[in-house]
């Protein structure tokens, strides 16, 4: 017979919980670094921007995009089109998505998205704004092992 040790069981669950907290995906764009995009497993594309956005384009890695709708792009009246793995969002009327954070758009996917690449974001005058894909480093500001910088 196997005998359960409650303390050991609680310790194991605590370790899994802490690992999940450290490496968990963001639940909204406000948790992310500035000027980043992130795609969730359900196809929500989060953003965090310090400038108003006049348009965006990116490729979805690992999946085919069947469609795009909603989010702050939809609320701003953007036309968001998807073809293959590429998503393009802009406004015919010159509308913008205000600086801030949230859900940029919601994608219908075929396959499992592993990230976004080829990210291009423009401000309202068409100038390119440097954006990257958000990757949580899990860095808590502590000491980096093997680092000897003073």
Which ranges hold each PLM region?
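Primarily marks secretory-pathway-exposed extracellular/lumenal segments that are disulfide-
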Residues: 2-150
């Amino acid at each position: 017979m196997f005998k359960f040790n409650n303390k050991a069981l609680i310790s194991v669950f605590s370790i899994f919980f802490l690992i999940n907290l450290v490496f968990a995906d963001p639940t909204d764009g406000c948790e992310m670094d500035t000027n980043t995009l992130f795609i969730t497993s359900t196809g929500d594309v989060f953003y965090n921007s310090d400038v108003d956005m006049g348009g965006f384009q990116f490729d979805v890695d690992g999946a085919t995009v069947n469609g795009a709708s909603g989010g702050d792009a939809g609320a701003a009246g953007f036309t968001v089109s998807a073809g293959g793995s590429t998503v393009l969002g802009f406004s015919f009327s010159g509308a913008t998505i205000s600086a801030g954070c949230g859900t940029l758009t919601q994608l219908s996917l075929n396959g499992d998205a592993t990230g976004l690449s080829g990210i291009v974001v423009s401000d309202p005058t068409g100038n390119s704004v440097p954006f990257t894909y958000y990757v949580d480093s899990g860095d808590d500001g502590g000491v980096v092992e093997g680092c000897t910088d003073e």
